[in-house]
Amino acid sequence: KDDEILISELEHHSNIVPWQMMCEKNGAKIKVIPLTSKGELNYDSFLNLLSKKTKLVFVNHVSNALGTINPIKSIISKAHEFGAAVLIDGAQASSHIKADLQELNVDFYTTSAHKLCGPTGIGMLFGKKEWLNKMPPYQGGGEMISEVTFEKTTYADLPHKFEAGTPNIVGAIGFGMALDYLNNIGFSNIESYELDLLNYATNKLKEIPGFKIYGEAKNKTSVISFNVGDLHSYDIGTILDKFGIAVRTGQHCAQPVMDYFGISGTVRASFSFYNTKEEIDYFCKSLERAIAMLS
């Protein structure tokens, strides 16, 4: 009771709802690190919110809605000064930028295989042994036990303590192959190539009348979240789909971000290492056609 968890206004719903559920059970409180108009985490507010009551800081490495890269190394360091653990959601970051978890000194870091060219239904949680050894298992079953009697059960060593039952074997193999594939390309190569695509697309899209980008952080990945005039994001996305262009529309499971900007949603274009400038040219022309059809 009275313990505090810090999360940011940039979070995906999956980084908000579980903590709300937990706080309802144990009486802890959630404190929210606000955004700036550029879609960046307000670092000064973060520093002011930190206190001895802070037990956990949970922020995303990269915003899935805006592409903002958060200054997680500094966040981790400052949180540790107050004795707080830090959990970083790396789902949106892991396929675009390299994260050295040892250098970051992060307590927990998560990601999902499907964001890394891998299969759905499997992900990864990195945790420091000092924390994982203190934590009880969250599931019971086979493999996670050392010895079972009707009087008492003892648990297996890490990581098996947290891996009850038959694992997703096919998913794990696919995840491993996907990581080998990306490592062969090289994350530094991916990051520099995607940054070039981002700059190219941003400059071309800004030439379109009424085009507005949400989230213009100095440091961001290859995500452009936008609207055009008063056109609805869903309508734009539907027409682009007919032209063979895949974009995401709506709130991107980040309703607080949309609320901050006072909008119902955006069109989100995400560029990856397999995209080309020629495809961006086609995207821009198709967007102009969609705008003309809807105007």
For each feature predicted by the language model, list its residue ranges.
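Pyridoxal 5′-phosphate
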Residues: 1-295
